[in-house]
Amino acid sequence: TNDAIFYDFYNIFSIIAIMNEELDLLNPPSTDFSMLDYDCAYIPGNKVRMNYKYISNASKKFVTAVIARGWRRFGKYFFHPICNGCDECKSLRIDVNNYHYTKSQRKAIRRNADTHIVVQKPSLTDAHIYLYNKYHSFKHEKDQWQHRNISQREYYENFVDGAHDYGREVLYIKDNKLIGVDLIDILDDGISSIYFYYDPDYANLSLGTFSLLYQVQLARAYKLPWIYLGYWVDGCKAFAYKPKFKPQEILDGFPHVSEEPDWVKWSVES
């Protein structure tokens, strides 16, 4: 009888220890802060305010939880908007298991039959910096994006630092040179699409489309159901490509990690 009581207590304490460990993983030590309002890049005339968490050692479990609740990650910084009087940023995710390829997407795959792909931990080389700055200079001329050359330190802090065991870069190589870099997180329930840049001299390859289609392929290989696309703002040209990858779900708001996120089926036509 005493042994039975001992084992009951042992099991209870084991469960409590596991629950506490789960809570610790979902609430890591962080430095929390907000930025002062600045001009919105998505809606002219609006102001942006971001809520940030700086976490030096975020677990995959934590990142999975917050990405599914509308947060984004750059380096060791996690963030989501808390804009005054505006809630236009909606989170999107692709339903991988039911994904449907369009004719134009199949053409993009065929056009990249000779494009070499490497998946590895994020890295920093002169080729990365050159390509990143070339792409943003092109977008400045074409779409009036704000632009200044990124330094190696800035690139490292944004795209290499904080990758831990889940961050990856997908390198696209053609003619023996780097022509595209896709930064992603491979999480417990999906792939979080962080940032993509490419060589505008290879615009005919539709690398932006192809990179997302490769994420679909990668997610299927890992048996992951979702690809998290980040934010969509109605009428914003920079996000116009996102609804083309169907089917999708949309999330309104940024629920706490203790709350279940309410994702619903969505298309831009609905």
Residue map of PLM features:
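A conserved beta-strand-loop-helix scaffold within acyl/acetyltransferase catalytic domains
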Residues: 77-84, 98-204
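Short secondary-structure junctions
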Residues: 29-32, 72-76, 248-252
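Acyl-donor-binding surface of acyltransferase catalytic domains
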Residues: 16-17, 36, 40-43, 50-125
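Active-site/acyl-donor-binding loops of N-acyltransferases
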Residues: 80-81, 90-97, 226-270
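Aromatic (often tryptophan-rich) hydrophobic motifs at membrane interfaces
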Residues: 170-251
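Short, positively charged and aromatic/hydrophobic N-terminal segments
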Residues: 5-18
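A residue-level signal for conserved active-site and pocket-lining positions in enzyme catalytic cores
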Residues: 66, 132, 242
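Helix-boundary/low-complexity linker signature
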Residues: 22-37
